[in-house]
């Protein structure tokens, strides 16, 4: 009858005086009777409870065992933490609150740990982005010296091209000289014909 509410009703009046152990990593096949058999050898047990889903009625994978004496609970913790039950290694810890807060704490405790991890991950992301931004700025500062280096050979090339530019201009002048020399050679022949 430990599965039903009868056992829970018996333990409810005195539950605040009990020392609770929270058992994590339970197999879905493990029942309250299985937990009772595992822990009752270490002392008198006042209550055993495994929370179940409202709709599927399936175990949530953790449970609670309450001892009348704190010494018995601590002794059971030392003996059962890491023990294999239904192929699972039990993780046993002292629970801080009674059953209602334990159930909420079990849900909220896991959620609280996950929430505490998420801001750390979020806080890391801006750090990486901030560390990357100065690297980009450094690359921008490095670009001007490379441009100066590129400008210097261009200037040299321009100066060379300017020094080479006069020869084609000189090529034009001999043509003019040839045309002038031809006109000069033709002019004396005309003067001779006139003399005749």
Curated annotation (Swiss-Prot):
Keywords: Developmental protein, mRNA processing, mRNA splicing, Nucleus, Phosphoprotein, RNA-binding. The keyword Nucleus applies. One of its GO terms (biological process) is mRNA splicing, via spliceosome. InterPro entries: Nucleotide-bd_a/b_plait_sf, RBD_domain_sf, RBM, RRM_dom. Signal peptide: none annotated. Residues 184-196 have a biased composition (Low complexity). GO terms for cellular component: nuclear speck; nucleus. Extensively phosphorylated on serine residues in the RS domain. The keyword Transport does not apply. Disulfide bonds: none annotated. Coiled coil: none annotated. Residues 91-196 are annotated as: Disordered. Residues 91-106, 145-160, 167-176 have a biased composition (Basic and acidic residues). It is found in: Nucleus. Belongs to the splicing factor SR family. This is Probable splicing factor, arginine/serine-rich 4. It comes from Caenorhabditis elegans.
């Amino acid at each position: 009858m430990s599965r039903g509410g009868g056992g829970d009703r018996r333990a409810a009046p005195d539950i605040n005086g009990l020392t609770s152990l929270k058992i994590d990593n339970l197999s879905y096949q493990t029942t309250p009777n299985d937990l009772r058999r595992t822990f009752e050898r270490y002392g008198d047990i006042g209550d055993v409870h495994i929370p179940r889903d409202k709709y599927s009625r399936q175990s949530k994978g953790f449970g609670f065992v309450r001892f009348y004496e704190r010494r018995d609970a601590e002794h059971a913790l030392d003996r059962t933490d890491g023990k294999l039950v239904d192929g699972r290694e039990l993780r046993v810890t002292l629970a801080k609150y009674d059953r209602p807060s334990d159930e909420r704490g079990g849900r909220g405790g896991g959620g609280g740990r996950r929430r505490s991890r998420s801001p750390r991950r979020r806080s890391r992301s801006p750090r990486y982005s901030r560390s990357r931004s100065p690297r980009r700025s450094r690359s921008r500062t490095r670009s001007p010296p490379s441009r100066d280096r590129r400008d210097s050979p261009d200037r040299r090339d321009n100066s060379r091209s300017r020094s080479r530019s006069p020869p084609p201009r000189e090529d034009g002048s001999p043509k003019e000289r040839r045309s002038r020399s031809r006109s000069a050679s033709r002019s004396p022949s005309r003067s001779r014909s006139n003399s005749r």
